[in-house]
Amino acid sequence: MVDALTYDDVYVNFTQEEWALLNPSQKSLYKDVMLETYRNLNAVGYNWEDSNIEEHCESSRRHGRHERNHTGEKPYEGIQYGEAFVHHSSLQMRKIIHTGEKRYKCNQCDKAYSRHSILQIHKRTHSGEKPYECNQCGKAFTQHSHLKIHMVTHTGEKPYKCDQCGKAFAFHSTLQVHKRTHTGEKPYECNQCSKAFAHHCHLRVHKRIHTGEKPYKCDQCGKAFVGQNDLKRHERVHTGEKPYKCNECGKAFVCNASLRTHKTTHTGVKPYECKQCTKSFASHGQLQKHERIHTGEKPYKCDQCGKAFASHDKFQKHERIHIGEKPYKCKQCTKSFASHDKLQKHERIHTGEKPYECKQCTKSFASHNKLQKHERIHTGEKPYKCDQCNKAFVYESYLQVHKKTHTGEKPYKCNECGKAFARHSHLKVHKITHTGEKPYKCNQCGKALAYHSTLQVHQRTHTGEKPYECEQCGKAFANQSYFQVHKRIHTGEKPYKCDQCGKAFVGSSDLKRHERVHTGRETLQM
């Protein structure tokens, strides 16, 4: 698949040394070629994002070019490509694009490029050179085009508007890419796994998953990344910079995508709809993640244990289990976390902030995930289905835990007493029996609890709140686990089976009580 032709594809850059070696006629020829290239691309509606282009061409021989405009003369015919070029050197450049020739090689990483100018830009990833500086905030960039894009964050100018959803963009090319989110067009396909992308740069970054290449390295901690944007986001962990601010509530974010998602909590707009279940999402990224529920696709695989993930975020979090990295530190209690979103959730324990509100019952939550879980109580949606017994679940994590009832797998083992558990959360609860730690205190009765979620359930004993209501008999519960057990009275489901006599039970606590009949241990009074 051949990419759309851009000015960079046909622009040939000379260093000062190379330019000095050219004779006057060669220099003149070069200027003419660049001017003609400018005109040709302009004629087909190319969107100019670099105002310096005309500076390359302003000394051209305009009179000679003007004459050819009248005569239509095109002395060099590219027969193989069915195109005519005004100069031989322009034809040569075009041939390089078609043949894929890459004669300019980096002496540090052996990566090769078709043009010297691109090699020079690439070398800056090794040297750290950022020659293009913003005169408003001092931020520096490796490429002039990146500086121009950054400048828009100061001016806010977005003249290009999508006629389908009204979203505005700073550049025409960005609008064209955005339109593909509506049409579903993905012209850039990976030749290794056939995954397709709407944007060529996304394909380039994706290919590094296959090659293992991570060319962008953090100067402070040495961590390497697949894409430049990933590095930029990571660097903000060290600097604490949050450049994207919500103009409604003043909340700031590390990346623009997080700000866009946050803004939907104010507007409620969800323009991205799933074609399989008609569920809508605030961002295209959220839609893509959701679609993997239907397809089962898990493109992110751990090299160490082989575990695969549907989202890159979950993959990154998992990687930190192996290396033990927790780069996100709470400034109030110095507790560290493997991911930024976990730190944010934790910080809300200190601030009490609950920015995510349910529109049906006005209940508020500290995280968007908790709001989503809660909303399924109202909708009854259970998108995750067990392929062995067809039981459906609200979340994939619940499905994974349920599957262990079929396999008997208990991968989470206590390193103090050897007891094993099906869920990591159950192991965490168990560990408290050894440590006795209870950091969460009820402000009404002073009772201390091991977990924030347990504190929330406990507080319902004071408020009388019972958010989990049975649709069949109307009985309500303060605790979701009690609600789940109660529903089995109606369905007749008894998932907990005694290994010794085969008797089945509605809840795990019922099974435990029964097992004491066999062991001879006294049953606890209820």
Swiss-Prot record:
Which residue spans match zinc fingers labelled C2H2-type? Answer: 104-126, 132-154, 160-182, 188-210, 216-238, 244-266, 272-294, 300-322, 328-350, 356-378, 384-406, 412-434, 440-462, 468-490, 496-518
Q: Which residues form the signal peptide?
A: none
Its annotated compartments are: Nucleus
Coiled coil start-end: none
Question: Its GO CC terms?
Answer: nucleus
Can you tell which superkingdom this protein's organism belongs to? Answer: Eukaryota
Keywords linked to the UniProt accession: Differentiation, Metal-binding, Nucleus, Repeat, Repressor, Transcription, Transcription regulation, Zinc, Zinc-finger
Write out the tissue specificity statement of the associated record.
Expressed in brain, heart, lung, thymus, spleen, lymph node, liver, kidney, muscle, testis, ovary, skin and uterus.
User: Is Disulfide bond among this UniProt entry's keywords?
Assistant: no
One Pfam family this chain carries?
A: KRAB
Which biological process annotations from GO are given for this protein?
cell differentiation; negative regulation of DNA-binding transcription factor activity; negative regulation of osteoblast differentiation; negative regulation of transcription by RNA polymerase II
The free-text domain note is:
The KRAB domain is necessary for its repressive activity.
Q: What does this protein do?
A: Sequence-specific DNA binding transcriptional repressor. Represses target gene transcription by recruiting HDAC1 and HDAC2 histone deacetylases. Acts as a specific transcriptional repressor for PTCH1 during embryonic development. Required for osteoblast differentiation and sonic hedgehog/SHH signaling response. Binds to the consensus site 5'-GCGCCC-3' in the promoter of PTCH1.
Q: What is this protein called?
A: Zinc finger protein 431
Which gene is the coding source of this polypeptide chain?
Answer: Znf431
